[in-house]
Amino acid sequence: MEQGNEVLGYAKDTNRKITHVVKERVPYSDEPKIEHQLIIMKNNDKPVKPKKGESPKNIYDYTALRIMNKSKSATMNRYFKDHPDGETVLTIDYTPNAMHLWNQCKMELSEDKKIRQSETYSSSFNLRKGYSENKLKKDIKRIHDLRLKHPE
């Protein structure tokens, strides 16, 4: 029985190590063009007065772009076509999976009542009262760094 418990302990420890490696350690790609980026843009859109009989359209101040390096210029061109006065707030040049990172940020920041996300577009959001752009940048960097942090 004691020997069985010892083997089980080794198995659990090995499983913990494997799970940690799988979740946390992602090597850089050999091809920079397929690496992911997360870019937070400030839209700077001007409010549009609704036409008679229409309800006002929700204006979102920020957009999260989850892109691969190879499609960056096309994505940015599309973005600026919709938001000509847009500006880059934050760029995370390398993240193993930009979509996963944004989903994690969105979930945490929404639960903490720091952002209000669009119900229609998964990447559009507004900052809540009392939450600044600087705090947003710090929180996203912190969440990104936590995903890549390795225990000693």
Swiss-Prot record:
InterPro entries in UniProt: DUF3627
Protein name: Uncharacterized protein L30
Source organism of the structure: Acanthamoeba polyphaga mimivirus (APMV)
